[in-house]
Amino acid sequence: YDSINKIGGGSAKVDLTDAAIDLPMFNWAKIPGENGEVDASFNFKSSSVHKIEIDEAIIGTLQGRGVFEFASDLSISDATVTDFKSPGYDIDKLVININDDKTIEVLAEGGLIDTTFLRRTKGVTENREISFDFTSARLQLAKDITLQGKLIGNINKLGSGTAILNGTLLLEQSPLIEEATIEASFNEYFETLSGTGLIGGVEANLSYESLSNATSQLLVRSQNAGRTLIGLDILDTIRGGELILRNVYRNNNFDNFETEIKVTDFSVVEAPKSIRALSVLSLTGLYSLIEGDGTKFDVGVANIETIGDRRILKNVKASGEAVKFELAGEYDRETDELQVRGLLAPLSLISDIIGVIPLVSNIITGQDKKGLLATQFEMSGKLADPVITINPTSVLAPGVIRNILSPDWLTRESGIRIDSHK
């Protein structure tokens, strides 16, 4: 101790086993009885602690090293923490600067950083402005939403904030969009994301917003539907096309949601087994649909409901110059069981027949019977090797071309689910 300049220092080993500690900034607490050991040195000036250096600290589930500097009122003014580990955190380096106006600057780098504390209006963020700069292989943004990359932003005194995300955004640990630049806004109750990046190696636009009652919405747009659907692990048989995909989530677990998909001007390069099976009926032109560049479609629409592992295909339909089909049913990812029923019509063949059949106008007006040349099909069993059933009587049965071509032609023919057969 220098009595003239009133400065000095020392070291200490502290046993905190019986202590209770709460760090709301990291949503962490230690209860009495948990392990607590700290090796530290300290400097003081004018009878007040000026700096504490922690050589090693193991306190409950927290461990790390750090240097803490104090203001004249003994509040922390600056802190540098290294090798910090705690539930939700694996930080190589954390730097915190607290300015005279109580605004906070936070810089962190490491393998795992839980950023959800930034959205809590209690504790460290209450009535403070915060700016942050995080870089990590795993930035936890919300439940089941993480970012690999960099997050820079700020929060005002009311708890509302904005941020820029650069990197790969993941949903449930699966990449959603890569090499992305996304703008975000958030507070304690909601968040919105909007930006561009790569899905399946092609550029896509993504937007996300939380809605009322714990619901949220995800919208994806792309000029290359095929690559985007592959990147989202939805479908791998489509090539080209323009995509609009919308998910409306019913809860915060993202396991109960409605999906709407619309694809225009695309090809199916490997026809479903139901279409391939129709070739045995020797219908003119059908076999060519599964060869070469695939089947061309002008538009395809899918409405799918997800409840846990169940995928309920409410209506999946597509139409082009050569063929039109609609199907509905259900798939269970846990059991791999599939139950689908639908209709398929080779429109090029219908067009040829219309040209040679008398009284075409009467046929087109139709009746409530099975459509002319509309083939019913059903798939059931395991998705990897489904059992396919064809109703050949519908191929030659008299019926209604108008019904085949109408938007709701599947309503009377399909709409089954797995549990309807139990």
Segments (PLM) and residue ranges:
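Polar/charged alpha-helical tracts
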Residues: T82, D92-K93, T116, N156
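A generic structural motif
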Residues: T80-T82, L107-E109, R341-L343
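Surface-exposed, gly/pro-biased binding rims or lids
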Residues: S348-I388
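Flexible beta-edge/linker motif
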Residues: K93-G111, S160
